[in-house]
Amino acid sequence: MDGLKEITAAVASLGGTTDLSTYMVNFDLGDMMDQSAGVVIDDVHPPVEGASVDSAMDVDAESEDEKDEEPGTGRDEPEVESEADEDPDEVEDAIPAAVPSTIPLSTTIRGFGADLGLGKNLTPADLAGNGLGKYAATLFSKTLPTLAAVVEQKGAIDPGSSVAKSIVTLLSSELGNALGIFSRLPTREQNKMAAVMILMKVLGRTALPPLTKTDEGVLSAINLVFSGAKRKVLVSTHSDITKFIIFNDDGTIPTLGVDTVAPLMKYYDPRLKLTTLVLIKNLGNNGTVEVKRRSKGKTLVMRERIPVECFLFRAFPVTESSDNIYATLDFVKRLLKGVSTQSSYVYVKNPKSIGDDFLNTKNTSLTLGDAPLTVKLSFRKPTNATSQSGFKRWLLICKWLARGGRIELGPKSTLRSGHEEESLEEEVNTGCIRSMASLTRLASRAWSPKNILKVNDRPVMTPSILNEIPDFVHRGNTLPIWLLFAASLRLDIVAVKEWLSTEGGDPRSIDVAKLTYHQYLFLRLLSDAGIAKKGLSKLLTATNNWLITEMSFIVMYKGSYGVNPTVLSTISDNNVPNLPIFSWIGEIPLWSTSGIVEKVKIVHTNSSLVSRMMLLSDVTEVAKVHAIKAKVRAEQKASKESAKGEDAAKKAPKRKREAEAGTETPKKKQKEEKSEKPKKTGKAEKSTGTAKVTKKEKTEKKTPQTKSTNKKNVKSVSAEAGTAVTPDEANGKKKSTQVKKKESAGQHTTEKKKRTAAKKKTVDRPSGHRPSSKKEYRSQEFVSSDDSSDEEVISKPRVTTTENMKSTKKATLASNMDDDGDDDGFMTCAGQFDIGGGSGFLTSTAGRNRKSNKQSKTLLLS
């Protein structure tokens, strides 16, 4: 347990240096955060409190100044005199009538101590007589009832709550200091013992219920010790818990859960800060006994091994001399007599003689002490110890520690519909952890469910669990404690375990940029306390370029000017450059920050330094870098301009060649065609195109769908459909030519879009309602007499125009009209084609007859 105390001692000395690889030789994050103006790091103390089991709430965890005080006094003389000068009425008014939301322990207890400070003026006769009566009235009528209400309000009645038990421990420390003002007891240990006795007398029924009614560690330790013996274990406690047994702890009594099992053992509860003595009967008796049981209306007689019986009672181990012990008991007796309260106590000088006669008999009562000062303990009927849920609780914690602070959840519970509660209760009673729900249910009986976190579908405990772990669980090995703590802080426990172990090479590295401030403090404590023999630089690495630059700048700046750059706003010396840092971090949104980056952002937000600068290892390099960047920008701009000039030079000869050849670009020619077309012609085109599509659809309905069609069928069908084109020919040759020109321009789109459009039309429309453009009605009867004009239209280069692509009516025309001879398929009048497939493309005869292709396209364009 020395490592635990070293951690607590290391809290007060967080300063120092940490060597984080080569980038932070003297970089101190904690020191830098403390110096930042207006920055407050909240809740840094929970990891520190949880780091120690023995001293988290221990009454011995007082400051060194209090240890150096004179014996018999709890505080300095000036403080007592200043408090003693207060009006007693003001002290009474300071005590609230109702229970406050926050516990004013320092105000209430120290106010009580100030009132009792008048006891310094008591004469020896008053101390020898009943002079403590009025002070006992103040103690029991004003102070302790209020504190009892506070303890009760904080959940002390709940057996699973440890908050109130910690309050009792804190009260005993404060009350011990207050009693030291006038008790005239020579040592602080005597004053603490007197305070605990008084608190047990006043708060015992509320804060310290009988042992069998609460889930204490001693019961779990008993079950843990005898779990492999295959014997029933019975436990019992005495009825009156306000009877004080004081025994001389000379180290001869073994510790339960740590040492070998003996008839008399002791157990120290880290939560209650109280010691329990355990008397074990039938330990060496391996005989059997007949047991009658009822099953299905029948009485069965079975033989079982004689159960082990454990009788428990609280006691106070002391190492003082007999005179000091009797002086303390006498003081408590006279103080309680002032309020007409009797106390029963006994001092056992020789602890080896405890229970000698009791273990050899079947009596359920035990008499301790010598006449006339004797105490009789009457024990209850022994009950089955396995009914205590604490046994499962400590087994759970043992598994937790053995697996590095985590528990592998088993298969999911087979919860029956409508019986989830019964299934969970069954799992808890059997100690089976199959789901997060059963784990929470089991843990909630011993500690708050808020202490359970779920990280990556695995349960992890918060640091407050460290105050719940007794000594018999970790048995002095602190490594599982640190691993549990690391897991509760969501650290990589594998890396921490390798770092804490003295064997092996370098551990797995952790990126320092991903650490939170609490995680950094915890690792720093382990390093400063000497628990981690390997340096912190072996564990932490800096992989972010910004963090490396940041640390290098801070180390350089502090080494050059002796101050961190975060406090430059308070420096008036002109020789120190007033350069702001961390300004770049202000551009990062708060929702995307994490870990140390968030803390740095807080530093930036709270600082008065608003200018932007570059974080470099040397301040003089700023101007050089700006000049270099300006030069690079100029070169990039010049290169872009030269690239534009080259592109213009490449385009000029192309236009010149086109002018010499007498050709025009497709866009230019298309614009000319649009300008030549009258408006009425456009209307005629629309109406004609609509009529044409309608008539073709009507003809299409009459056409039977076959998988293959020969040339004769195509000609016959085309002959029937020939009448559908006669209204279009009646409009005149000029209009027909213009319609063909405009429609042909809309057909030259990219090949990919054509195929997609054709497939969509084929799938969306029923096969009987396909447009006639999808059918190969190719015949020379529909070819216009003016073949030369048709040849010009087909020979035009392909142009994709936005206007034609948006036209919904023209999109119903055939989409595969390329004249490049590829194997993708052409609309020819030769060979067979598949109508049922929906494509209407021919792949076997593609590109065979060039003249037929042109004629087919002319047909479709008409």
From Swiss-Prot:
Residues 57-69, 78-91 have a biased composition (Acidic residues). One of its GO terms (cellular component) is ASAP complex. Residues 45-91, 633-824, 837-862 are annotated as: Disordered. Residues 751-760 have a biased composition (Basic residues). GO terms for biological process: RNA splicing. Coiled coil: none annotated. One of its GO terms (molecular function) is RNA binding. Residues 633-650, 657-686, 694-703, 761-779 have a biased composition (Basic and acidic residues). This is Uncharacterized protein ORF1. It comes from Ictalurid herpesvirus 1 (strain Auburn) (IcHV-1).
